[in-house]
């Protein structure tokens, strides 16, 4: 995945037509498009392939299963054009290693801590431990919340500079893109504040400009 704008679009649309229109409008501004189950369940897994023709695609499936099932999901997503797949780290080393082994050159990002308030109840308490496990298992990067920049710093202190950190929660959830980058994130992830706006391209450009202020 290129590292130009440091901006990733979380395209949580359920309409394939609208998703493609938004993807086309932000082409050249965002470094990747992240899709989740709502779009895939509504329009089918072929959306991975169609969007991959416009941008790198991150499949945010937050895979949390036994190793064999993890392997099947990752292989399927990559075969359809995914550049990366997001998996949960709490499943343990065997499932994480299965994801890495099945990636076929695509990148695997492990969730250490999600961006919503409820994340602090359980997984946040083990974020650093899961980050260390991810490094041991060979994942390419980690998910840490832009809504809590101090947690980005904590994960960065564990994983070092050789691993990517992607930070969701910018925009609608209250996080600020430049704060996340300043805290150590490589990319910020923005969803509704871009695809739900009247002018997605202008909104994406505004977030990219905010990021540039700290580069």
PLM feature segments, named:
Residues 1-59, 64-72, 79-82, 121, ...:
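Conserved N-terminal beta1-alpha1 strand-loop-helix module at the mouth
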Residues 2-7, 65-149, 161-162:
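Conserved anion-binding
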Residues 13-16, 38-41, 89-93, 146-150, ...:
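Short beta->alpha connector loops
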Residues 41, 45-61, 101-113, 153-170, ...:
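Alpha-helix-loop-beta-strand connector modules within alpha/beta enzyme cores
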Residues 62-65, 90-91, 113-115, 170-173, ...:
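Short, acidic/turn-prone active-site loops that include or flank metal/cofactor-
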Residues 99, 179-215:
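C-terminal helical cap(s) of enzyme catalytic domains, especially alpha/beta-barrels
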Residues 139, 146-194:
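A C-terminal functional module that forms or caps the active site or interfaces directly
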């Amino acid at each position: 995945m290129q590292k130009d704008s440091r901006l990733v679009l979380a395209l949580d649309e359920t309409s394939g037509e609208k998703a493609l229109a938004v993807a086309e409008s932000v082409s050249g501004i965002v470094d990747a498009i992240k899709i989740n189950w709502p779009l895939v369940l509504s329009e089918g897994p072929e959306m991975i392939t169609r969007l991959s023709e416009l941008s790198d695609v991150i499949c945010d499936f937050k895979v949390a299963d036994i190793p064999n099932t993890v392997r099947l999901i990752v292989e399927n997503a990559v075969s359809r054009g995914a550049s990366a797949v997001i998996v949960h780290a709490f499943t343990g080393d065997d499932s994480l290693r299965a994801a890495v082994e099945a990636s076929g050159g695509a990148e695997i990002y492990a969730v250490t801590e999600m961006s919503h308030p409820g994340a602090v109840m359980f997984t946040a308490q083990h974020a650093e431990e899961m980050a260390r496990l991810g490094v041991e298992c060979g994942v390419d990067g980690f998910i840490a919340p832009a809504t809590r920049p101090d947690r980005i710093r904590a994960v960065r202190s564990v994983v070092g500079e050789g691993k990517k950190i992607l930070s969701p929660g910018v925009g609608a959830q209250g996080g600020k893109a430049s704060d996340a980058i300043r805290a150590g994130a490589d990319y910020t992830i923005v969803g509704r504040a871009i695809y739900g706006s009247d002018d997605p391209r202008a909104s994406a450009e505004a977030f990219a400009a905010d990021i540039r202020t700290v580069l």
